[in-house]
Amino acid sequence: MRKISLHGIPKNRRKRASIFTFCLLTLSLCTLELHAEVSADQNVSAHARNIEIDNSVVTEHETKILGKRVKYSATTGTQPVWNGDSDPVATLFYTYYQRTDVKDNTTRPLIISFNGGPGSASVWMHVAYTGPRILNIDSEGYPVQPYGVQTNPYSILDVADIVFVNPVNTGYSRVLPKADGTMPSKNEQQKMFFGVNADISYLAEWVNTFVTRNNRWRSPKYLIGESYGTTRVSGLALELQNRQWMYLNGVVLVSPTDIGIERNGPVKAANRLPYFAATAWYHNRLDETLQSKDLLDLLPEVEDFTINELIPALAKGGFVSENEKRTVLAKMARYSGLSEAAISQNNLDVSTAFFWKDLLRDEGKTLGRLDSRYLGIDAKQSGDRPDYWAELTSWLHSFTPAINYYLREELNYKTDIKYNMFGNVHPWDRSNNNTGENLRLAMAQNPYLNVMIQAGYYDGATNYFDAKYTMWQLDQSGNMRDRLSFKGYRSGHMMYLRRDDLKQSNQDLRTFIAESMPAKGEPAIYRR
């Protein structure tokens, strides 16, 4: 059974809200009219495609998670972003899942989920990771037809409610015209939305409104972000505490960026090697001794070499001794699957792009960037980087039809607005990125706040050893190390695409939620 509701508005106010909404609709003030190619100085066309600024559709569902029946509702809709003058400047599209076969969800954990980009919709984790429905793919994550969705038997909806948020210009979220009908200029839009700190600021306001409307202030709250979404949620942790007075229980960083923690020079170059080794192992390009080891037995050996031998050698640059250079060169070649000549020509600093092109060059294949299990075919075997990203083209095969079908046909959200898998958010202001320090400070201020990092061993864009390095550097005092954890998976950037890792990563989330929930009556306090 499906129904449309004024979701989040108390019943005794719904009649007044309905009248108010009708009036606004009559005056055309509640409808965003956007033309696909409208420019900053054009008036909005009378024949533009329409999306409502503030609406919701609720559908009721039932599924099985870990073998047990779970009833839930799915709310799809839009909620405005207001400026300081209380004028709507954007509307964000979201999907909100609530378990309905529980007596009271006001104290149930709430997961607020963001993807990255910047400029990416929330589609990836929504229909492939934590949501109750996931796209049709095979057990390793490759697309299959017919496209569509299926039950996610490992979804965390059994233990937490989830809202998937699409930032401005992603999904169905859009910038709104000004009062005179013209769109804000590109510069105005960037100041409001498209930058590290602007993004954090408006999303914190939006989250506050969402939590208030849906009566979730008493719920333990968690942020989960993937890729650039980890920059977003790291900054949001402090912004929510200091500007919205909303304190969290946990932050989950999936395939994290550097979150403003610099790793340049020798560290940046050396940190790639463990990822090179994992990928070479996967493609059977290591010698028999290394290839016969399990991946999790091999990687600690490579990590130890990286920290204790490779970084010191790179730090010495052109002054490294010939003997030390030969030793390091031989070990790098052994662990990476690349030739000593190729590594030497790059002065021990091999780029990921070259690795993707060179590892299987003799077979005429290239490697995927976000997931190096995927293979591509270039026009020429020569060159220093692949022609295209094999994994991304593969993913778009299945994700694009799945989300468009699912929202319209199963969740009953119908609009002619295009669903932006990737939206126009550039140029993105990356200045003053202190999100790692923001997360550290949020943890220091909030003894309840825990952080978990999840990363795939075959991710070449945000590699797993960089993720470990970020965790190590996040709190150099070591005083909060018991609230920081790392989980690795035998897949890539979206580790949950591999069926075994979908199961394990969701279980890791369940454990993280359970362990970050303080015992009843336990105070948020540091003890001597």
Model regions and ranges:
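Short alpha-helix in the alpha/beta-hydrolase fold that links the catalytic acid
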Residues: 449, 463-473
